[in-house]
Amino acid sequence: MQPDFLILGCLLCIVLVLQILALLRRSDHTALDHVLREEHRVGRAELREQLETLERQQEVRLASFARSLTDLVARIDQRLDQLTASLGEDARKGRQEASEGQQRFADALGQRLTELTQRNAQSINEMRTTLEQQLHVLRADNAQQLEQIRTIVDEKLQTTLNTRLDSSFKLVSERLEQVQRGLGEMQQLATGVGDLKRVLTHVKSRGTWGEVQLDNILDQTLTQEQYARGVRVCPDASEIVDFAVRLPGRGQYEAPVWLPIDVKCPKEDYERLLDAQEQADQELVRTMGVQLERAIKIQAKSIRDKYIVPPHTTDFAVMFLPTEGLYAETIRRPGLADVLQREYRVVVAGPTTVTALLNSLQMGFRTLAIEQRSSEVWSLLGAVKSEFGKFAGILEKAEKQINTVGKSLGEAGRKTRTIERRLRGVESLSQEQTQVLLDGLDVDTAESDVDSDASF
């Protein structure tokens, strides 16, 4: 290919030289210019033809080279495929051989382990059988000897302990029953105290009116024996109070003292005060407040004059106001509560406060009952303490006897083992001789039992 390029270059140089000469002589040699132009055209045509020929040759050579390259790539791919298949087959054979070798090794190892396991299990079973037989024989001998000793000891201890423990437990049971009855009564009192606490923290009856509301509160708080309805507090008078709480007298047989509780509800005066407060009329509010105070004082004076009659009643009474709002307004009035307590000896109470007051009285009743029964419980506990002291002494004696028997059993076991060691080489007797010796031992045992009973 290089000579062709050299020829083509030379031709191009000649054409350029001719063109330069033609340009230099254009003005004087027109004919020559025409000739040169024709030759130049012919030269370009020849040059184009040569270039096309050269291009075709190059294409033919390139096509041949491409076919050769394609054939070479195909042969290389075929060779690589053959090589890959050969390597894969070799690897598969290697893996198969390795797997077969591992399997043979695992089978041999498993068989060896199985044989070792079977031999060990057989040896262990033989050892276990031998030990069980020896232990069974030893256990049977010990059990027989200990059973004989235990039978004798149990008979003695059972007779003595049953007699003494029965008498002691009978006496203690009687005392404990008395204590249990006393504690049961105290538990009932404690339950009542719990009910009292629940009522103090969760009062259900609120916001109702008059005597029905107070009756419900009394019924929820006190028992029927602790209060009464429509009580004539003074035998010489005809005034009857709505409700009265029965307080115990100073002595056991003295008449009860009544705590009067009267229901008062100046509803009209309170409603007029509420209307004035809604109208925001300060002067009217002040006037209605004064009227409410006057009505409360009139009711307190009426209670004092009618129902406070010492010694038949307490030296004060309770005015029950059925609504919390009326009670709060009464307490809120400056100095009104103090005047009622100091001048009229009347305590104002609403639904909540009267419940708290009644609960306090209920607590006092329960405390009084506990005080009355505490001396009985204390005496009973003293008797139980004395019996427990005796019972502790009996248990201590029984413990000493049981310890003595345990030591005797331990000593008998040690002597039994010593005798067994020494009798290993002794020849066994016949059945008749053995029975005769055992009968002799029974006689000796009976005599020792008689001696032991005498010692107990």
UniProtKB/Swiss-Prot annotation:
Residues 36-60, 106-158 form a coiled coil. GO terms for biological process: DNA recombination. Keywords: Coiled coil, DNA recombination. InterPro entries: DNA_recombination_RmuC. Belongs to the RmuC family. Involved in DNA recombination. This is DNA recombination protein RmuC homolog. The lineage of its organism: Bacteria, Pseudomonadati, Pseudomonadota, Gammaproteobacteria, Lysobacterales. The gene is rmuC.
